[in-house]
From Swiss-Prot:
Originating species: Caenorhabditis elegans
UniProt-recorded name of the protein: Putative stoned B-like protein
Domain notes: The Asp-Pro-Phe (DPF) motifs, which are found in many presynatic proteins, are thought to mediate an interaction with Alpha-adaptin.
Lineage: Eukaryota, Metazoa, Ecdysozoa, Nematoda, Chromadorea
Pfam families in the record: Adap_comp_sub
Gene label: unc-41
Keyword line: Cytoplasm, Endocytosis, Repeat
Motif placement: DPF 3: 1024-1026
Amino acid sequence: MSWRDRDFDPHGGRNAFRLTDESKQSSSERAASMRAMRSFTQSIEDEGPPELPASLDIDMIEGVSMKTSDTNDTIIEVKPGKVDPQLGETQKYKMAVPGPGHSEQEQELHKSLIRDEEEDAEVEQVFAASAEPVVTPPKSLNFAETAEELRHAYDQKIRKRPTTPTSACVLDGIAFFAGSVDGSNDTIPTDAEKKIKVSIPSGRRRKTENMSYSEFYESMANQIPGGGGRRMSQSGRTTPLHDYEGDILDENPQYKDKAPPAPVVHRRSSIEWENFADMEDKMEQAEEKARKEEKKEKEETAEVAQNDDVTTEKHQNEVEKSKKMLNFLAKPPTVEITSPDAPHQGAFHDNTPKEPKVVEEEEDDDLPTFSEDMDEARQQVMKEMTESVVKTENVENEKQEDTHISEGHVEYGTEESPAVTDGSYQQDGTENAYDPNAYPGYIWNYETQEWEYDPSYVAPEEPIDQSAYEAQAAAYAEVDQRAAEVVYQREHAGYDQGDFYTHQDTSYSSEAYAHDQAKGYQDPNAYGAEAAADNSQEYDYSAYGGYEGYLAACRAYDEESQQPQYGETVATEAYSQDYGYEQQGDYHHEGVGATDENSTSAISGYEQNGASTSLGYGDAQGYDGYDHNASYYQGQEYQQEYYQNHKYENSQYQVDQHPAESAAPPRPVAPMEPLFKQAPPQPDPFGWDSSGHTGDAPTASEPVQELSPTPEASSSTGTSAPARPPPARPEAPKKDETAVDAAAPPRPPPAARPPPPRPAPANKEKPKEPEPEEDAWAQFKRMTEKVSTAVKSTESTLKNLEETSAANDIKDESYLANVGGSQGFVNESTQKEIQRLTEEKKMEKLQKKKLKQQGKKAATPTLEPDEEDAMDRAAQELAMKMASMRSDMADWKAPEMIPVKEIKKAPEIRRVDSASAIPPRKRSSIKDVQQDSGGSLELPPHLAAPQDSIAPNPKGDHAPDDPILSAPAWADFETSEPMLPPSESGFFSNKDASNEGGVSRDATDDPFVTTVASSEKRSSFVADPFAPQQAALIDESYDPFAVVAVEEVVAMAKAKAEQAAANAENEDDFYNGRQSPTLSTPTPEGGSPISQQRPNAFEDDFKCAELTGLDTPTPLYDEDDSQPLTDFIPKFDGDGWDLMVRHPIKKKSFMAERCWKPCYVRLHGLTLYLYNDKKDAQPIQELLLQATYSLSDTTLQAYDVYGKIHTVKLQFVVYKEKVGIRPGQISRLVDGHITKYGLPLEHSAQCTVLLKFGSLNASHLQTFVTTVEDLLFKCKITRTAKPVYKQDEVQIHCYDEYSAFVDKEGILSDQKARVRLFCLAFLTGSPVLEVGLNDRRRQGKEIVRRKDILPMYTERWIRFEALEFHSIVNKPEFDKEQVIAFSPPDGCFFEIMRFRVRPPRNREKAMTVKSIMKIAGSKVEIRIEAMAAAQIQRTRGSDERRNIPCEDIAIRFPIPEAWIYLFREERHWGVGSIHSKKLRPGKVKNLKDRLLGAVQASEPNLIECAIGEAKYEHVYRSLVWRIPRLPEKHHAAYKSHLLKCRFELSSFDLMPEEFLPRCDVDFTMPLATVSNTVVRSVSVEQHEDSDRVEKFVRYVAKYQYKVEIDYVQCADLDLDMADPSVNPEAAAAPVPELHQPTFNPSTQESDTQQGYRIDFNEAEMGGSNRRDDSSSDEEPDSHKMPIIQIDMKNYGY
């Protein structure tokens, strides 16, 4: 078998050098084997440095892996990915989901949407250019994915042959974290105080210059930002830094005498790669360079400590370059606090969340991935490690305490628990075989089975200055006392923000601070993780909510390092702004270093709530008000108690404490944190409060203070200052303050007793060092973080204000200045009555709540007014001081504070107003109202007056110092409900119409104290129209200088009551409207007590809506059903119809012409038969009618040169879904309602015309249309298809059809109306439609989802009669529930049901048409007046009304045939009708010309109309006036429009013996105004997504009036027939005789003359041609033009 056909063996290269039987080989043989494998690997890797893949550009690393990775990605041979048969093309990948929390969620992506790794590299590289420092909302980070993704991206490109697998890739260390080198990425390790002492191996760092990859990796390191807190787990035997050419046991004397406890089995199943030998030279050179740098660092540490200077970014980068270069291979075992949802799993762990474990189990949380045989050996080692840990705990505990204290590392807040000491791991030479994940900075050597100090391990932070690296070097050097001193120097002497306690790898142990968090240090939230977070610690990104949040905090932290030091920004700016952390009152900042299940207590301790004076740390008082370092010095129990009970006592520092008002308070020494930590409690991935900005806050929360070893410092350490009030806002440090000494202070007392904090030494004012250049995007990100935090703070503040604001009690509809709104016209007394009831309920709730609270805690002691006033002032001063110390609260104005004990009361007091102060009990009189108007529960004591002073005093006579008139009461929204100022409308002129003589109160009256009502001394107060009548307190506080006499108020009240009654009588809506008084009026009872009855003209939104349509004089239907309903359209009983059909039926070619061919149509059953002639036996075509067929609307189409023809199409319509917009969707698109596919979709109709019929007789054709519609309605159909639509849609069409006769007087008769319901549905699957109508049988019994209710004013219920249903409708369901349920056929416009209604008899006509023909001798005038009535439509829930117009109006006035020629004119193409001139009647035409006499009088127009167009239409034999719409847009209803047609008959014109009696009026209205039918709901059941179904309802009312024509003979056409008194002389003139033609047919013989008559042949009249063939020899004889004959005898129409 060819090697190409075999599966690729990633271990083939190194297996060639491996012994066959590994269990029998000695350690030397294994070492030789490994060296051979390393040599093999090096030979592969040394072929040339590859180009750095774009995916390794750390600028683009966000700490978030976009997909998981496995070993298959690392091999060279790339094969097509196998599709999981279960998942198909949709595979699950980890994706970063944007949004608060940025939690990782599994998204299902189709294969086509998944990017390849090459695509990832390019895209991410481009992205990295603009987002170098990733500062995004906090999110948990899975480091295994990050490492794997980067490693695979690199390995795939450079690996030419398989290399040996191992735990870490070369690039993993570098690419692991964005920002591991670049100083601009200011990431701070979570545990700034965590320390693990490490000693660098004796051999110097090697192979930096000589190594072939050195330049490559140096350049690569330059690109990589500082990697804060790497989470790589050391899972390999070694790293390039430990790839010694000789046996490691021989080279490292520390392990010389130690033998591995068990044989090391090579991890053959490892999925990870490492190049064993390619880094040996680099190791040597790097270690050598590192040692040199360590010396420099040590020398510079003292310098840094004295000058308090931060080393330049350049030097930082250089140091970090070298260290990171050595570091990037090693994945040191990290002790981290990982959130349960994103536990630390080493570099390449599975992404399986682990629950938080106890300290002993925390080891397994970070286990690296081992092969099976390796894992067994590892378990054995772990067992020994655990035993050794237990044995050495107590010993190390003591040693650790001494060591830490001697080094100046006082473990604050700890009680020297074993976890603290062991976790600190600062004992020299500690070599316990601990869990690989437990010791950052250590590497597990699998040859020696020992821990080796990892010289490549670098604290994951950004700009760590030289002092930081000195401490690092010291920490990694041989762990002796000197190293400890160096660490101390770095930490205490020169601790500027640049130091960051860099290499105290103490990662706050959850044992020390989190395990017993309630007792000590209260979670980093109390203070710890921020201030004490050691940048070198493995960061718990969960505390930040993610790596990005961590970066943000670190960057902010580092920026602070560039500030003139902590003292300058003191707890406000440095801590709030520069750390990217806004002191937000609502944020519970989870600490970075150690978190625990007790973090909630810490949260209370570290709640940046400026209003809480009992917070433990970082409140608005900054560091002055409270030594936040005290949490470190105190015992765990004591510290918890301190946070809860102490109120920023400054007892923690004495010497430098009080000067700290100008200088920053002391920064506590970072407590040593044990290595074993517990995972923090599960953070809310979307909670910005706990893990969102907490990440920023912890590092930012408190800048690490530099601890002075001066005697002052030590003395202050031993003593505590007395408590004093909160200090003023801290100022910048003064220049003359003492410099920081590098010497270690005297050893403080053990931490068994909480020692006082170290006062901060005076920091010299040093020149501000230039901040490291930061990418603009990073700055923007950080600023965005600040802004978002500020926004959160503002939102919380606004939320509190919203809850407590008196504006809540101002009803929007009560602003009567804007006339309108549902409450705009409510009587004042009515409004007050409503509000009184509402506020009583509110007070009941408030009292229940208060009683409930009082049951839980002791009742608040009653205080005297003076005492409470003093407490208010003191609290306000305290709040002002607290605000003054916070830079972010510079613009904050302290609210009116009350003591903390009563903080629960504040919202209630804010809400207490005239309404809410009413006790929850009913009152029967105004006396009770005034006596009990307050209850005095909520009145602030400074407003409460003595109860004994009840002497009456007229309004306006109050003394200036009256509490009622004092400033708090005048503009106090806490104790009064805001009112509008007195207005001209008189809203405030009457307190109560029923309170004509109110109880007058003295200036010192407590308005809530019951008083005796004296009727003779009652005075009416200015009324608050928004408050209930009972609240007299508020009324007195407004307009106190307006004194209104009682008589005036009573008179005004009575006048307003009468006006309200009059308005109520006069204001009747035209159509089914609600009665709304135009003004807010008092109760008509005048001075009577408040009536519990509803007063006259009562109007509110709570009125029973169903009465709206019943109390109007116009009912919705005629209730008299004694007479049976007649057929709406009489049944057709003829044999068939003489019609015309368009021939040929199917067009043969595009250019072919078709003509109208006479035919005869019969209907038998559902079959339509088409004959050439009525006498034919065989039809020329048969057509079976189906339910999917439909008839078009009847239209007019050109027929010949004289006129048009009525046509109708029998068609089959197919709908196709395509992109487009139909008229109904435009408004929805404007509102943003777009389909789920992002494009507007319409279902366009594609019509297939089966037959097209025409007729010159409109009524004849209408009978045919009606008959066919009846047949289609009875056709049966079922839903068979189950289509799939991108956009589902349901259309319901409701057609009202109405006909009536109107006589000359305008009286309606012979009304008929019916309703037809059509449906057109495009629904996926086989759903069921349920249509609910306003059937009165269904009133009050509707059960329908809210989403299915259609937005119509539907409080109208009508009676259905003569119901007919389509066969598809579930008839029993309708009989039971009155719901039309059916499964609609797909894409079929069909009629669901039809029913009859009885229109009311006295209803106003929608359009009034009056037609008159005046005949004055030979002069004739046709006069038509049209006027549209006001049809009002109102939307439910609002008072908005709009007129419903009449549209497509056609008024047809019949013209005798003898006069037709008068309306015709010859044109160049034939004969046409004379069109009307649009002239408004009553205007003088050509006035200017007439005055000048320049032009003769113009010829009179034949037809003049004010609107629309009029002309003679031969198909109707009528003068047709067409109007598009009445009333016109922006025009009012009831406006009369006139058409005049004047002509004079000649001597040849005949006068008809009789005229047609009526004219026709047709029009439509866009709502169902005839029947008032309303589709209340459309429900789609059994549908996959009924919420996405678009629903449309179209209402059309089709009216047809037969209006009687008034024929009048008069003396003059200008005579006003309606009012003859206008021109009595003309009216009295004799009426001339009727016109007589010159040739009288009655006297002439028929042979001589014949009257004018147009003869139509049989075909023209709708009959069949005499010849079937169009091409006949006798064609010249056939008359194409009608013949005009004269027949005077039988003249008629």
